[in-house]
A protein has these predicted regions:
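Hydrophobic anchor at the beta1->P-loop junction of P-loop NTPases
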Residues: 5
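P-loop (Walker A) phosphate-binding loop of NTP-binding proteins
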Residues: 8
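ATP-binding Walker
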Residues: 11
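Walker A/P-loop
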Residues: 14
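Conserved substrate/cofactor phosphate-moiety recognition/catalytic segment
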Residues: 22-64
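NTP-dependent small-molecule kinase module
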Residues: 23, 96, 143-183
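Glycine-rich phosphate-binding loop used to anchor ATP phosphates in small-molecule kinases
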Residues: 56-94, 100
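A glycine- and Lys/Arg-enriched "phosphate-lid" helix/loop adjacent to the NTP-binding pocket
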Residues: 94-144
Length: 183
């Protein structure tokens, strides 16, 4: 089985995905990390190279390669504007696609930054000083990516819950079971 986690930036796809994979005994893949490895680049360089369509095509290629890997997996998917690169997988019977959703305020609370070398860091003073700007940008992202996620039927509202609680709720809501071969 493949569990896709979709959602806007900073909604919690990677953290939730890692924890869910660990709980279920599945492999975990993060599209950002897979893109960095495959194209031998940083995210900073990747997002500043080529057009959005070209970047989404490259992401689609990495999705295809990752989907060919055997075994159960949880796969966190970076927001992609050109959804053709993942829509073909949504109808597969061994795929559970979930869009993680939350309010712009809750997403803001989880907001982290990264430098040009992709090192993640928190800067709550800066973040809070620019709160209105970031809330507006998060709302724009939610609005902009809604069409991309239209075919993802499972919408999971996180309600500001902790990652541990979100994983518990996902396991219960979708009746997920551990992979006995890996646990």
């Amino acid at each position: 089985m493949t569990i896709f986690l979709f959602g806007v930036s900073n909604v919690g796809k990677t953290t939730t995905g890692e924890m869910l994979a660990r709980k279920l005994g599945y492999d975990f893949y993060d599209l950002d990390e897979e893109v960095k490895k495959f194209y031998n680049t940083t995210l900073e360089d990747f997002v500043n190279t080529g057009s959005l369509e070209e970047r989404d095509w490259k992401r689609g290629r990495v999705i295809d390669m990752t989907m060919k890997k055997k075994g159960n997996k949880v796969f966190s998917i970076t927001p992609i504007a050109y959804s053709d690169h993942f829509n073909r997988y949504l109808a597969c019977e061994d795929v559970l696609a979930i869009e993680l959703q939350d309010s712009s305020e809750h997403i803001f609370d989880r907001l982290v930054f990264s430098d040009e070398n992709d090192h993640v860091y928190k800067d709550d003073d800066y973040k809070n000083a620019h709160r209105d700007y970031y809330i507006r940008e998060i709302k724009k992202d939610i609005w902009a990516y809604t069409p991309s996620f239209l075919k993802v039927k499972n919408k999971f509202y996180m309600d500001g819950d902790s990652p541990e609680r979100v994983v518990e709720r996902i396991v219960a809501e979708y009746g997920l079971k551990c992979d006995r071969k890996k646990t």
